[in-house]
Amino acid sequence: MAIKLKGHETFALREGWLNKGLAKVDANPKVFSENYGADALGVGSNMAKAIRYWLKAGKFMEEPPKEGAKLTDIGQIIFKEDKYLEDIFSLWIFHINLAGNEKLATSWYAFFNLINIDEFSKEDLMNILLEKLTPLAEKKAIPERSLRDDISVLLNMYVKEKQQNYDPEENKISPFAQLGL
């Protein structure tokens, strides 16, 4: 199996990104293929790539060849019934899809399905993930920098940290911290 690391461009999923992405894909299936995804989403180009990645990794969007982007069945339901992802159940659905997606979110898959530890350091997690992912990597070397970036993003998505001098314009808070994982 090919593993996927760092598709998120080192951006943890932020508050508002899923609903913004769902709305833009629903309105225009070519939003990511016409090279104006960043403008349409009102973010930088790497953030637009990250939003695209998160929508696909969480199985809220797919990109069939020659069709552009389209919402999956669950993406359509979430967009229709909980457009702003205010219901924690919508976040749980996304989390379950992400944690089960070994193809696009390999580190999340390994962390939530192959590892059973309560306490760890980043270095511990790095070593454990290397051990778990090496057999999945089909004899290819695992780029340690990419794995470190995945670990940082994964932890930033689920850990609720108190931020000093919080600036709402930065909006780096991930909605998944409220899952309490």
Predicted regions and their residues:
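Donor-sugar nucleotide-binding helix/loop cap in glycosyltransferases
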Residues: 1-181
